[in-house]
Swiss-Prot record:
NAD(+) binds at residues 273-287. Keywords: Cytoplasm, FAD, Flavoprotein, NAD, tRNA processing. One of its GO terms (molecular function) is flavin adenine dinucleotide binding. Homodimer. Heterotetramer of two MnmE and two MnmG subunits. GO terms for biological process: tRNA methylation; tRNA wobble uridine modification. SUPFAM superfamilies: FAD/NAD(P)-binding domain. The gene is mnmG. This is tRNA uridine 5-carboxymethylaminomethyl modification enzyme MnmG. Its cofactor is FAD. NAD-binding protein involved in the addition of a carboxymethylaminomethyl (cmnm) group at the wobble position (U34) of certain tRNAs, forming tRNA-cmnm(5)s(2)U34. It comes from Methylorubrum populi (strain ATCC BAA-705 / NCIMB 13946 / BJ001) (Methylobacterium populi). Its main location: cytoplasm.
Length: 624
């Protein structure tokens, strides 16, 4: 046993997608940071599907990038099939996504961590927290090492009392071949945190050399791949195609015949899994009338024969999995390299947190990722960045940062978690935001990079790149505002406008669906020199301009309610007229603002009026 004690400003437990962003963010702010993980070689491991981004998720990756996080740049370096989802829909709901080479991704992430000044990787298992005077003061490792710190961030993913299920077999593990985190689960239990159980699953991995690719429909990468990071000029990694197949009636019959052997239906698992990523057993039971379910065969790397069959997550016994695979077109002779499985794990009710991701119960302790009830690499990365940033600011005695719903999907996600809690793994969608016209992938840097610079987590390279980009955008916008046409002049160029005699600027012309940048460049040739990314951004701004003006009124009202602070020590029992039901609901969340109180399910307008009056009286007394 070791008895050494080392001092850091911030300790991050876990080297997954939340952990690396937390550690890197804390170090960027200037905190002396330790990243504690079982093995350094597993940092950045993609435990489930080899992909980054998607609908809603791509927005989070862009926001992490805007705050100088790692995920976007690493995904750009490792991406092997870039596709922009929802390309035919409006810009606000488009989602960049890429398949990633699993090995390339981990190597690139490990290199990024190694190159981060002030960040030390410590191999070991965090077994307990050091608590002094009612607040976290460090972490104890299983081998006896004592790490002192001003703040600790826990990002244990599925490791917290993790239990793998394959048919009737149960294997204690955080993921295949790795031990679960039992000590920290006991620690959180001991300190009174509300813990629950969730589950997720993964499909069997296939040997791509035994797949009949000629029998499959192929899905190719975009010809013009869109990077995640604004710092990435172009994608240089070779791009590959994925195969598409479907389940068959024979597959469905096999599943129905063996449902009693699936832990989700035998009683082996009672916890809930992700609604939007159901197992193949759930799909067959819930959508029994369908003839087949789509499966995407996603290669896990350029030099790796392993294929991830996206769409058939399962925990059925291995022999049943083999039968299922053999009954799928193109996979009749395919070899399974590793069986699919379900995994149960502990999570902390996220209503135990405030909007900074610090726990209310234990100051100095921050939580991020699946431990907060979310699912997905991108959700984890976003939380990790916010938690690491705030842990560093707490250790440095600076004011903590809150990202609100009107400025970012990060704010939407965190507010959803800490206000509503979860009953199933939380996944980000654009539909979760009431301000999604403003929260687009193309303006994430404009929304968040200046904020990140003020908070100290944006480095000089990104700051300089952002300044140059904004300068070019402003110059192009000014040029559009100085160019104009009358309806008659427009008609001479083949543009049909209302003959009202009013001049319209080039920016206003862009708001017409039939007028694109190419049409304007034909009229004013110097516009052809504007970089495509800036031209596309200005076209989007013009398209949404009238709607954004209306939305700004909603945002102003939102910010007005968010400005009404509710004291952390507020005793709801002292507010006359507040019903017992309202007191219980409010006490369960302990909202920090009137706006957050309004978002608690079941809180009535009458209760909000009483809260607002109480807050006003408190301000009056404080200034008297």
């Amino acid at each position: 046993m070791h008895a050494e004690s080392t001092r850091y400003d911030v300790i991050v437990v876990g080297g997954g997608h939340a952990g690396v962003e937390a550690a890197a963010a804390a170090a960027r702010v200037g905190a002396r940071t330790a990243l504690v993980t079982h093995r350094a070689e597993t940092i950045g491991t993609m435990s489930c599907n080899p992909a980054i981004g998607g609908l809603g998720k791509g927005h989070l990756v862009r926001e992490v990038d805007a705050l100088d996080g790692l995920m976007a740049r690493v995904a750009d370096a490792a991406g092997i099939q870039f596709r922009l989802l929802n390309r035919r829909k409006g810009p606000a709901v488009r989602g960049p996504r890429t398949q990633a080479d699993r090995a390339l991704y981990a190597r690139a992430m490990q290199a990024a961590v190694a190159e981060t000044p002030g960040l030390t990787v410590i191999e070991g298992e965090a077994d307990d927290l050091i608590v002094e005077a009612g607040r976290v003061a460090g972490a104890m490792l299983a081998d006896g090492r004592r790490l002192a710190a001003g703040a600790v961030v826990i990002t244990t993913g599925t490791f917290l009392r993790g239990l793998i299920h394959i048919g009737e077999r149960q294997i204690p593990a955080g993921r295949v071949g790795e031990e679960p985190a039992l000590g920290l689960a006991r620690t959180l239990d001991r300190h009174g945190f509300r813990l629950g159980r969730l589950k997720t699953g993964t499909p069997p991995r296939l040997d791509g050399r035994t797949i009949d690719w000629t029998a499959l429909e192929m899905q190719h990468a975009d010809a013009d791949p869109v990077p995640f990071s604004t710092l990435t000029e172009r994608i240089t990694t070779p791009q590959i195609a994925c195969g598409i197949t479907r389940t068959t009636q024979r597959v469905h019959d096999l599943i129905r015949e063996n449902l009693h052997r699936s832990p989700m239906y035998s009683g082996g698992i009672s916890s809930r899994g992700p609604r939007y990523c159901p197992s193949i057993e759930d799909k067959v039971v819930r959508f029994g009338d369908r003839e087949g379910h789509q499966i995407f065969l996603e290669p896990e790397g350029l030099d790796d024969p392993t294929v991830y069959p996206n769409g058939i997550s399962t925990a059925l016994p291995e022999v049943v999995q083999a039968g299922i695979i053999a009954a799928i077109p193109g996979l009749e002779r395919t070899r399974i390299l590793r069986p699919g499985y379900a995994i149960e794990y502990d999570y902390v009710d996220p209503r135990e947190l405030d909007a900074t991701l610090q726990t209310k119960r234990l100051p100095g302790l921050f939580l991020a990722g699946q431990i907060n009830g979310t699912t997905g690499y991108e959700e984890a990365a976003g939380q990790g960045l916010v938690a690491g940033l705030n842990a560093a600011r707490l250790a440095g005695a600076s004011e903590l940062a809150v990202f609100d719903r009107a400025e970012s999907y990060l704010g939407v996600m965190i507010d959803d978690l800490v206000t509503h809690g979860v009953s199933e793994p939380y996944r980000m969608f654009t539909s979760r935001s009431e301000y999604r016209l403003s929260l687009r992938v193309d303006n994430a840097d404009e929304r968040l990079t200046p904020r990140g610079a003020a908070l100290g987590c944006v480095g000089s390279i990104r700051a300089a790149h952002f300044a140059a980009s904004q300068g070019a955008l402003s110059e192009a916008r000014t040029r559009l505002d100085t160019l104009s046409l009358t309806p008659n002049e427009a008609a001479a160029h083949g543009l049909a406008l209302n003959r009202d005699g009013l001049r319209r600027t080039a920016f206003q012309l862009l708001s017409y669906p039939e007028i694109g940048w190419d049409r304007l460049a034909a009229i004013w040739p110097d516009l052809a020199a504007v970089p495509p990314r800036i031209a596309e951004r200005l076209q989007t701004d013009a398209t949404y301009a009238v709607y954004l003006d209306r939305q700004q009124a909603d945002i102003t009202a939102f910010r007005r309610d968010e400005a009404v602070r509710l004291p952390a020590s507020l005793d709801y029992g002292t507010i006359a007229g507040l019903s017992n039901e309202m007191r219980v609901k409010l006490d369960g969340v302990r909202p920090t603002t009137l706006g957050q109180a309004a978002r608690i399910e079941g809180v009535t307008p009458a209760a909000l009026t009483l809260l607002a009056a109480h807050a006003r009286r408190g301000r009056t007394q404080a200034t008297a």
